């Protein structure tokens, strides 16, 4: 059976993408040339904010005092889960040594980058969870200086809950600046801060483009597009839960794709029927986003069986992948292309987005086919080292000289020759290239 689209997207994120490169390139160039003052000018223009950029300890304390105790407890709960998961990830990175030949020791070390810049969105929604996800993971990795920047609200500043989350999760500096100017401030080391060695966190198309342009000068977690989600559901799935989860992810933005892949026509048709009323029940801003995302970007796909469903999912390589079907272990073993996987009706992407412990900074736009999401590993440099005895390196030197000459790299060969001549003056070696 060829897959059947019961609903097909009329747009794709690529067809919707506007050309922001010129704008971002100009802002980055202006800020790099003009420094702090130009960044302040852009903050006043775009954020309509003229307060302190670097929050003082007193400002942090005042902001934290505004956060209700129940919300503080929830943030601490989420932070603890993310921290413990990140610590478990870090434990998989062990320093190793191997004696490749007698007398030559090679090794691997994992070294955290010195300074991390965490972008925390604060526009339409105050992304408290993004502060938790990015700052906590950088702290566990061992970064010496962690910066968190977030767009301030005019006359208000950064949302107090974001300040509280960034503070308790380990941010050394909290900045009231967003957009390209926020990313640039961290990358260029403005306002007396160290230059970020890596930039992480979600953001709008301008933030994503700024990170893309800066990549190479600094590291980045990924180039993120609109968030996307796919649900795999069979006849056992509850259409109410499926519909609720699709709508919950569509509210991210007008161009956030959501996909339902199923082998049960009745389920698919029921979900299509239910979606409009579920969207209509949302608050206005959320409703407008979800309605546009469902209308323009959503798809409902009917497959013959679970193997075809799995193959379809892997082809889409979604950021978020939920399975509501029988035999969850089969799906866990079979599926291979996703940012984060949520198995069973009991799980939901919203848990991962906010508090379950896995990171919500994930690859979008099909990038899950070749990369994973934000983790401790993104903040770490995996470096290698070696040392050895003269005798141990002797066969390595001989092989190096011959390979280098065969490649035409005489300078490399001579670096081996000189050592053999110095350490073994009474021996003769055949170091010619016979290829």
UniProtKB/Swiss-Prot annotation:
Give the UniProt keywords, A-Z: Metal-binding, NAD, Oxidoreductase, Zinc
What is this protein for, i.e. what is its function? Answer: Catalyzes the NAD-dependent oxidation of (R)-2,3-dihydroxypropane-1-sulfonate to (R)-3-sulfolactate.
The reaction(s) annotated as catalysed by this protein in its Swiss-Prot or TrEMBL entry are: (2R)-3-sulfopropanediol + 2 NAD(+) + H2O = (2R)-3-sulfolactate + 2 NADH + 3 H(+)
| Listed cofactors | Zn(2+)
Cofactor binding annotation: Binds 1 zinc ion per subunit.
Q: Which residues are connected by disulfide bridges in this protein?
A: none
Positions annotated as active site in the UniProt record: 319-320
Question: Key word Zinc present in the record?
Answer: yes
E.C. code: 1.1.1.308
Q: What class of enzyme is it?
A: oxidoreductase
Give the binding site residues for Zn(2+).
249, 252, 353, 412
Binding of NAD(+) occurs at: 119, 181, 204
Q: Give me the gene this protein comes from.
A: hpsN
Q: Which GO terms describe its cellular component?
A: cytosol
- Species whose genome carries this gene: Ruegeria pomeroyi (strain ATCC 700808 / DSM 15171 / DSS-3) (Silicibacter pomeroyi)
List this protein's GO terms for biological process: L-histidine biosynthetic process
Q: Mind giving the lineage of the organism this protein is from?
A: Bacteria, Pseudomonadati, Pseudomonadota, Alphaproteobacteria, Rhodobacterales
Protein family according to the UniProt entry: Belongs to the histidinol dehydrogenase family. HpsN subfamily.
How is this protein named in the record?
Sulfopropanediol 3-dehydrogenase
Q: Does the keyword Oxidoreductase apply?
A: yes
Q: Which PANTHER family match?
A: HISTIDINOL DEHYDROGENASE, HISTIDINOL DEHYDROGENASE HDH
Q: Which Pfam families match?
A: Histidinol_dh
Which molecular-function annotation in GO is an example for this chain? NAD binding
């Amino acid at each position: 059976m060829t897959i059947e689209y019961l609903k097909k997207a009329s747009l794709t994120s690529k067809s919707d993408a506007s050309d922001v490169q010129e704008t971002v390139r100009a802002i980055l160039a202006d800020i790099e040339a003009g420094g702090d003052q130009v960044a302040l000018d852009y903050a006043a223009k775009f954020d309509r904010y003229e307060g302190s950029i670097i929050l003082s300890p007193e400002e942090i304390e005042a902001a934290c005092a505004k956060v209700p105790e129940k919300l503080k407890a929830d943030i601490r709960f989420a932070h603890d889960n993310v921290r413990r998961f990140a610590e478990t990830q870090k434990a998989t990175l062990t320093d190793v040594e191997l004696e490749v030949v007698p007398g030559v020791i090679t090794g691997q070390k994992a070294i955290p980058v010195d300074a991390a810049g965490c972008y925390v969105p604060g526009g339409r929604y105050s992304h408290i969870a993004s502060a938790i996800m990015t700052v906590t993971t950088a702290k566990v990795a061992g970064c010496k200086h962690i910066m968190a920047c977030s767009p301030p609200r005019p006359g208000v500043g950064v949302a107090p809950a974001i300040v509280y989350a960034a503070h308790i999760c380990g941010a050394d500096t909290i900045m009231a600046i967003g957009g390209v100017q926020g990313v640039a401030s961290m990358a260029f080391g403005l306002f007396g801060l160290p230059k970020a060695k890596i930039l992480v966190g979600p953001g709008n198309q301008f933030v994503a483009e700024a990170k893309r342009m800066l990549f190479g000068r600094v590291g980045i977690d990924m180039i993120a597009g609109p968030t996307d989600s796919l649900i795999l559901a069979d006849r056992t799935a509850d259409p109410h839960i499926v519909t609720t989860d699709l709508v919950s992810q569509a509210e991210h933005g007008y161009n956030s794709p959501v996909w339902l892949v199923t082998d049960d026509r009745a389920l698919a048709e029921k979900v299509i029927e239910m979606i409009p009323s579920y969207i209509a029940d949302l608050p206005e801003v959320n409703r407008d986003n979800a309605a546009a995302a469902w209308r323009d970007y959503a798809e409902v796909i009917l497959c013959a069986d679970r193997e075809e469903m799995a193959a379809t999912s892997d082809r889409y390589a979604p950021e978020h992948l939920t399975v509501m079907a029988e035999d969850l272990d089969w799906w866990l073993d079979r599926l291979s292309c996703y940012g984060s996987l949520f198995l069973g009706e009991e799980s939901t992407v919203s848990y991962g987005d906010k508090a379950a412990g896995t990171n919500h900074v994930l690859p979008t736009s099909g990038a899950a086919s070749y990369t994973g999401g934000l983790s401790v590993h993104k903040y770490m440099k995996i470096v290698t080292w070696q040392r050895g005895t003269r005798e141990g390196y002797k066969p390595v030197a001989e092989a190096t000289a011959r390979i280098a000459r065969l490649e035409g790299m005489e300078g490399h060969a001579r670096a081996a020759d000189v050592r053999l001549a110095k350490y073994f003056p009474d021996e003769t070696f055949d170091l010619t290239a016979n290829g």
